[in-house]
Amino acid sequence: MISMAKALNAADQNIVSETGMAARPIVLIVATYIVTTLLQGALGSIPINKILGFALVVLLIFEWVSTRRSHLSSLGLLCFVLLSLHSTLVMISASQELNDLVYLASTMLMISLICSPRFRTSILEALLQYRTYISVVVIFSSMFLLLLLATGTGYVVAWGEAPYFKGLCNTEHTLASICTLLLVLIIFLVRTNGSKAVYCGCSLVIIYATLETGARTFLVPVLICLLLLIQNLFAYKWTKAALLLLVLFFGEAVFLKSGMANKFEFASGNIYADSLLSAITNGRNEIWLTDILAWANSGSMGIAFGNAFSTIYELNKRALSLYIWAHDDLVMLLYGFGLTGLCLYLACLCTLFHSLFASLNKGAAVLLTVFILFPLLLNGFFPYQHLVYAFVLLYSICSHELIPRKDI
């Protein structure tokens, strides 16, 4: 697996044709996607997010095929197409299957593209070109979240009896992934000499909104963003250390009164948890065990090529009375795409991790690796597209010294 990853990475470093032609519309769509998702509940039946998502996948495919890649990469694409065809033959819900296939394809294409230094440079150039628009998106989103929080709009009762914040999004986790993406954009704005006061204020609102969601999986990506933000706010180490201690002190006080603390309290005291592991994972270990056992008993075709992603929802509904996915990318791939798909996904991830440690300093590479692995293993990475976009942009930002700018 490691040798395959190195071969893929080496091949993708030697792209003959120019890359990054689609970087500008990709960045524009990602920034717009933040606003349309934040306003999702106010848009009614208008499928703007599906339109943007479809356009983004088309751009990613165009960008991928416009580069002359290795035969190994082309073989990987062929495997994905064949696995998708097999999945559609055994699916039980076309809409759910298409949704997961699009999310997975988008994620794997982005991971494949971002391993190219030229594409990372193109993404950075696009960020710089649309910097004013990105600034407007960040400030508008922060003010909108502040308005919702101040008026108590967008709170729902979930996971017990405590209220959790989801704004106008469909779930709390969706909002938390948006907040992570907004923090990444703030890092970019601060690194390009944006107003520290303005974006510190925005980041405080966004972090508080994340805490109110109760989505524990996003604590680690948000914490990583916070560390990188502090790293870029001040030049002297003592000021960075002092600010970090100050943030931790006040952060603890805010955390203890937030929805996140309620979620930890509910999970640790859940009377339905039959073990410590079940309490810590909030029952995810039972989902994983159910799905892995079902995969192991699915016959040779199911073991090798999967049983479709849509069937995992029905499986968990029958076994656990919950219509949910596996809450783990590897288990999801194992059941949906079988061993073949799991190996393909792992090869893609190994290629990415090799690229991270080859292009960044060790500390940054470790942080970005944890940024992916923590949600990937404990809840899911590819189902949360805003989190995927956040990683792609963060990797591009960390790969370059940015040009100072004077506007907000």
What does each model-found stretch correspond to?
Residues 128-155, 170-232:
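Alpha-helical transmembrane segments of multi-pass inner-membrane proteins
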Residues 1-66, 81-93, 144-147, 372:
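N-terminal signal-anchor transmembrane segment
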Residues 57-58, 184, 365-375, 381-408:
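Transmembrane alpha-helices of multi-pass inner-membrane enzymes
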